[in-house]
Amino acid sequence: MKQYLELMQKVLDEGTQKNDRTGTGTLSIFGHQMRFNLQEGFPLVTTKRCHLRSIIHELLWFLQGNTNIAYLHENNVTIWDEWADENGDLGPVYGKQWRAWPTPDGRHIDQITTVLNQLKNDPDSRRIIVSAWNVGELDKMALAPCHAFFQFYVADGKLSCQLYQRSCDVFLGLPFNIASYALLVHMMAQQCDLEVGDFVWTGGDTHLYSNHMDQTHLQLSREPRPLPKLIIKRKPESIFDYRFEDFEIEGYDPHPGIKAPVAI
């Protein structure tokens, strides 16, 4: 995960001080790209411990089309608590847009099923895309999508994915985002009988919050360790049938976790 540490250092060296929606303040750069060859290991940050349970359950929750935090709470995941209303609802966030994007004529488009069908039947298409950025529903969402748009690409029997993330909390959020989409690529590849290729991450407003500086310097002082390996124990009938128990991370030996406040 050298690329991730290099990004942190770049934001420290080149970032512009900016105000933000949360009132916390950031150092920010605009436009950055990282590429992870998923054949070389699972891109889970090793310079601090990442909470893999939260990453897996959040992705399964997205794939369910769920937008209420009850499922997350049932599995001891609290990463969405700050944005939920008193009933646990978040409005039409990621899961809704991925699985039931509303059309003007009253239909709903299941984008995940659509891209799976494209990967199986038209893998050379340049339109294998999922968008969470539904302009017509942004004002109903508890939080506008940060990781907003992703595209799949098949070449030489390998599945790659590029994500555009319009806003990126480099210290807290980005390790989750990288691991989550890498996991999704592995799942999609298994469902389509493909090998994994690259995960390409592209960031817009890429920032470190002002109250994450000490934590960032601590993380940069640590030496990265070898990447772990992802093992998927079974192949379900559908992308929507995976369970938490289907995934195992082998050889994950991270440095200790680093606590930091969430900007809300």
Swiss-Prot record:
This is Thymidylate synthase. SUPFAM superfamilies: Thymidylate synthase/dCMP hydroxymethylase (SSF55831). The gene is thyA. GO terms for cellular component: cytosol. It comes from Shigella dysenteriae serotype 1 (strain Sd197). DUMP binds at R21, R126, R127, R166, S167, C168, D169, N177, H207, L208, Y209. It is found in: Cytoplasm. Its main location: cytoplasm. Keywords: Cytoplasm, Methyltransferase, Nucleotide biosynthesis, Transferase. Its EC number is 2.1.1.45. CDD domains: TS_Pyrimidine_HMase.
